[in-house]
Amino acid sequence: MFNIKELMEVTEARKLNDFKIDDNKTFVISTDTRVINKNNVYLPLVGEKFDGHSFIENAIKNSDVEVYFTNNEKYNFKNALGLLVKDTKEAYLKLAKYYKDKINPITIAVTGSCGKTTTKEMLYSVLSQKYKTHKTKLNHNNEIGFAQTIFSLKPDVQILIVEMGMRGLNEIDLIVKYANPNYSIITNVLTAHIGRLGSRENIAKAKCEVTHYMKEPKTAIVNNDPIILENITDKNINVITFDINSPNLKIISQEESKSVFEYKNNLYKLNIEGVYNIQNALSAIELGLILKLSPKEIANGLEEFKPFGMRWNVEKYNDNKLTIVNDCYNANPDSMKAAIKTFFEIYKNKKNVLVLGDMGELGENEIVYHRELGEFLNNFEFDTLITIGHLAKNINIASKNKNKIHFNDLNECKNYIFDKIKEGNVLIKASRSMEFEKLTEGVAK
């Protein structure tokens, strides 16, 4: 992947000793000494709670690695070459950019408050119909995940899809500095991370960083929301909008695990319900058309997309009498309301139960947001409300539902669900920190 000349020039490294390396030998970057060998360069990353430098001395003693990066001159590299850099993470990102530029795939950056992972997966399913496509694994959406994604690229990749997350300003800016996307997608700007950023305006600024450092054709495909459009500061960017209220969109039907809609006179099907999932699909359609896919290829890609990873997974129990919609990957006030609305649109006139937990990172107004959600529930008739967590108790208090229960313990709630609810439909949703996946773990389907 890299010869010694490239390693030094790209990272602006300085040799700490005179250990000789064959100029023609190539090395692969590794950040983990547990799986390292002679063909690897060890690059120790430094984080808030870890420092890869603490493993260097053990690696020197117990491995045959020939090249080490470091930000510290103290190490004695007797039988290996030490390369000194100011910042090992910066060196990691520079090497990733260099390798990406050699392959030169069309690069697509995806961000948003909600739906970015789903959109990335839809894009991958669509664009793979025509191109050799690579994507960020799961939700490895920070700068380290970006570099790991790049180093897993194969030379024949034509399109790269990079998901970009953030918990504050300038975090996406750091990733796009090295990613240089040709296309950027913003799914939406909602209340996720409002506790950290303080306002929706700041969230929009952070998300719109995905339009920085773009390469031609410098095209942003974004939700038609004024707060997004106002925060795209580069006026040379070609902006294309998508809108769930577009006159070009006609939602034909939604039922369990199926949505059918028409967009720009073409019919599309998804194996998942929810207006917000149709909205996610619109950005994939728009980019597919730009990249010369036919409507049929796009339709095939969308139909092949499958829900994944605690994102609206429909699970059946008790001989199909009990349906649990597992949407517990994460939650904020907007995604909660959208999921609840979809749940009641799909599952009508049956015994419906909501199991809701704490929503995190909402800042000083966290109690208000939870009470507002409880009041929102008063728009619907349903059987039982179950809440878990000290914040979710405020949902319970604000709800006027006659049947409501609050638990402080996941196992108690799990036992109640499977002991008391034998049929009907259950939606489970909470922030990732609540670990709601444990509510269905180990239960026979």
Predicted regions located by residue number:
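Active-site beta-alpha connecting loops in nucleotide-dependent enzymes
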Residues: G47-F50, F308, C328-K400
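Phosphate-binding loop of NTP-binding sites
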Residues: K5-T11, E90-N224, I228-N236, G288-L291, ...
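ATP-dependent carboxylate/acyl-activation modules
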Residues: V110, M310-R311, S433, E437-L439
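Residue-level signal for inorganic ion chemistry
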Residues: L7, N40, A59, L95, ...
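Acidic, Mg2+-coordinating active-site environments of NTP-dependent enzymes
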Residues: E6, V10-T11, E73-K78, I185-T323, ...
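N-terminal leader/targeting and accessory segments in enzymes
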Residues: M1-K94, I346-Y347, E375-K393, N401, ...
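Short glycine-rich anion-binding loops that position phosphate/pyrophosphate groups of nucleotides
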Residues: G47-K49, K74, M166-L169, L190-A192, ...
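Mobile, glycine- and charge-enriched loop segments
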Residues: K38-L43, T133-H134, I144, Q148-L160, ...
